[in-house]
């Protein structure tokens, strides 16, 4: 019975993932998807039965649009999830942790060489994404040139602010001809458009949340916080955050 349930969940979740990642038309809420995903993960741990196409084994659905594919030498992995305070505290113990706002958009990677933007791409499945360089000029806040000659690779979120989404959502349609349900899918449809004209005027913004390569000249090059703050000198903003270092882990009651 558990194996049959696993197969059904894998089929169901992959259908949801396809609609979300490749059609910009979600079929269920994030909360419902997370509930089914957590059920699948628990059943897999209980039974030891994991299908090769299980969504627990991949970051995202493989892109199937006409955009050129981009391989990520450093995989763009997603974060682990937890609903338990105790698990979060155990993870934090003995290391600096950055707490960031979760932006509702599309993970994007920018590559700069000799002070110029040479490529922008989506995360895709974490290992292979899509080239969206042609749409970057339509973004509101991405520098095309920066005062930094060394190679720089940063990741962040491409998104549309809520007030702009509310203002624009009734005037545009998704790939299925329906109104966009949320800002994330509106941003994804805009960023992954084949024609840059479709991205212009949609108020797409980018905020970095990590430096994958470069910024080794900052005072503390091993500190993500220090590198993010260093980006401000190059004309970037960054996703708001605060850092915390926990040496001992208390035992709070999970709620």
Feature locations, PLM:
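Acidic carboxylate-rich catalytic motifs and surrounding loops in phosphoryl-/glycosyl-chemistry enzymes
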Residues: 157, 239-246
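Phosphate/adenylate-binding "loop-and-lid" substructures adjacent to NTP/NAD/dNTP-binding pockets
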Residues: 1-146, 166, 185, 191
